[in-house]
Amino acid sequence: MINAVQGHRTNSVQEAINYLKGDHDHKGVERNPKPRFFTGSENDCLIACESIDRKQKYVTGTLAFGPNERPRDKELMEVVKSFRATFMAGLEHGVNFTDFWNIHEDKNRIELNYVIPLTELTTGRQINPFPPGKAKEYFKAAF
């Protein structure tokens, strides 16, 4: 499994989520099978990002599995829980942070895509699951 972090984003989180939910990839090729929702909350991500005054509002990424790795949804949920525990350590999902996850299977592999608003929900302070420099690589290696 590869954790490909696309980075911190400044454009509309709705555009990012629409792309992940969309029937076509970035080249305009129809996705078959269609993307499917997995966990988290699109609406909560939209609300959280609208409350952020900072330039960078959210981060996106993909957990890409190899062609021979076919985890079932129950196993994928364990991956999400482990991801949250690693990159959002000490924070409770739904209380301190929110996210959105969906699945793409159109490239002969499972891709578990995520969007995470960069704000702690109870304080409005910035959070950064992928800090710059060596810390980011340390977290990715730990996961």
Question: Model features per residue range: what roles?
Answer:
Residues 1-143:
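N-terminal nicking endonuclease/strand-transfer module with a His-rich metal-binding environment
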